[in-house]
Amino acid sequence: MRKASASEAILNHYEGVGRFFRAMFYISKLQTFGAVPFYSTSIDATDTEALYKGRDSRELVAAKILEDLNYACKHCLDDAKYRNRASYIHKYVALALKARYCLFEGTMRKYHTNDPSTGKAWTADESEMYLKECVAACEELMNSGVYSLADNPAGRKTQYREMFTHDDGCGAYMNEFIWARDYDIAMGVTYAINNYMVNSQHANYAFTRQFINTYLMEDGTPFTTKYSDYNSVPFAEECTGRDYRLAQTIRTPGFTRDGGTTFWAPDVTYSKTGYQPIKWLGDNSSMDANTSAIATDAPIMRYAEVLLNYAEAKAELGQMTEEVWNKTIKPLRERAGVKSIYPTEADPYMVEYFQNRVTDKFVLEVRRERGVELAMEGLRYNDVIRWKQGELFARPWIGIYIPSVDTPLDLNGDTVPETLVTAKSTVSKYKILYIDGASEPGHKLSEGTKGNILPATSLERKWHDYKYVKPVPAIAITENPNLSQNPGW
């Protein structure tokens, strides 16, 4: 590359781009396996010593990733020409990835006593160092003034979801999208996102009641404080007066498509809890077939995440202040129609949600906000891993409250019942969730003939801490016996 006829700045920029992608590659490997072989140069096909070496320490790999990201942050250019679409690599993309990575690594080291890929204690306590690196990256990006939250107060009931369904998000949301996948019909770069969201083979996505309970009321107070028996609040009532993002993330009463001409109720036949996602789902139902080519751009890193990364790192460092809150959590909540209230005590529901292991009021509120704002953006799994909350994956699923079995329900608010929960093997015009004897997976109601949907109770799910990293594939160890297996696998 250095032989190219270009200025030193341009050469450094493209080396930064290359090192950005190398860092991204190794971040994925680190988060999957922990310790992996690290290579800083290309390998000759005859160099068997390099090809068949063992795993480098997780801490070495982590440090090398940070080196690459620091180089990219320093040398990738921030010229406007690299930012005229949100799909190019530039300085701020590198800063955003550095912030995301350093938050992961800092909290991973804080909450995990041992390196999961060795089962042994970390050789050095570097959690604070990584959290401070996250703060520095966020501050540089935030202070640049290049990015902001997309917020039109008149459109707050729809604008959140529109970011994920816009035909030209890379252009329309350049102020918030730091990096995105730029789909294009003319170039044949498309995907069938609608089909994944509504097709009977794919559309089994569903949120749990435990998570939906974390959405605040519009007045900024917890839903779980307003209702003492919060799990028994009927569906229409629990969707009323909530954070605007709720109705832009799941099907709630009044949800329509096709320009408002068709009502779409939660389909319990497929989305078993009743909390069926709509984020990413386009308005035009004629595009729901698996052959439909859709080109809505998909954000990979948004400015909202940078604010959340900053808030979380500051909270974890014990440095959350009202000034930090007002720059991060407050604007996110106000954009969602929620009054911002600076916390004075920990919400008992959030303490319980995170297994009574976290009691810091700021950490808990940042986690609440992160879950709501970044839902379905591919970050939650790694969040649960780094927080050492793997037991959440084995927590029983809880769905919407059903007042009575065999009684047709109107879940979309058009006054016409369309949903039925029954233990009878029957064919009906309704969308049906079969329970008890009619349900092979063991779907039930929590109180027998009424109560919360309890999907797939016959499915046994257990958590073991060795699952914080994935197993090294057996075929890889067969090919290279110098590779060790992760503990427990």
Residue ranges of predicted features:
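Acidic/polar-rich alpha-helix caps and helix-coil junctions
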Residues: 1-192, 221-228, 233-489
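Segments forming glycine/polar-rich beta-alpha architectures that bind adenosine-containing cofactors
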Residues: 208-222, 241
